[in-house]
């Protein structure tokens, strides 16, 4: 997945949701958006993950793919925290929707005994951000931790 393929289309949208995980593609897209559009009125919702936080990283999972996923989400969360402070007086808004385990194809076979969020619950948090008249730095949605 080459994020550069999306760059030329971003200007046309006022609302952008970065949800797909492919290594650092979310980070690259977000960085591009901030660099090019920080003075434009846009709402960017980034779906991160509690796996990218110290408190919810699951140390029991040995899979390298999970560790890699968590590492990229952690980097993304740190960037969002930093950039939100810089953008506080700018028209560009960045929202971090940080769900715990979501019942999707990606989580099948993992955390089989844990309560999982439904995708609709995450989409309601996204909707809240899009409709919000104020800035929301991070929404953490949890059932597990």
Q: Model-derived features: where do they sit?
A:
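Short-chain dehydrogenase/reductase
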Residues: 30-34, 77-83, 123-126
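Conserved catalytic-core motifs of eukaryotic protein kinase domains, centered on the activation segment
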Residues: 27-29, 56-59, 107-109
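Catalytic loop of short-chain dehydrogenase/reductase
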Residues: 19-21, 38, 42-88, 98-104
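Eukaryote-skewed repeat-based solenoidal scaffolds used as protein-protein interaction platforms
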Residues: 1-4, 31-42
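C-terminal helical subdomain
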Residues: 96-97, 111-145
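Conserved Rossmann-fold cofactor-binding substructure of NAD(P)-dependent oxidoreductases
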Residues: 1-12, 25
């Amino acid at each position: 997945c080459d994020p550069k393929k999306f760059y030329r289309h971003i200007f046309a949208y006022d609302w952008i949701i970065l949800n797909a995980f492919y290594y650092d593609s979310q980070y690259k897209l977000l960085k591009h958006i901030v660099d090019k559009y920080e003075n434009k009125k846009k709402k960017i919702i980034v779906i991160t993950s509690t796996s990218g936080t110290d408190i919810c990283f699951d140390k029991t999972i040995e899979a390298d793919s999970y560790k890699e996923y968590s590492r990229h989400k952690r980097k993304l969360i740190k960037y969002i925290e930093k950039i939100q402070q810089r953008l506080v007086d700018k028209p560009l808004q960045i929202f971090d929707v940080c769900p715990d385990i979501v019942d999707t194809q990606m989580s099948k076979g993992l955390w089989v005994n844990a309560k999982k969020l439904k995708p609709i619950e995450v989409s309601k948090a996204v909707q809240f951000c899009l409709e919000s008249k104020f800035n929301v730095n991070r929404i953490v949605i949890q059932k597990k931790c």
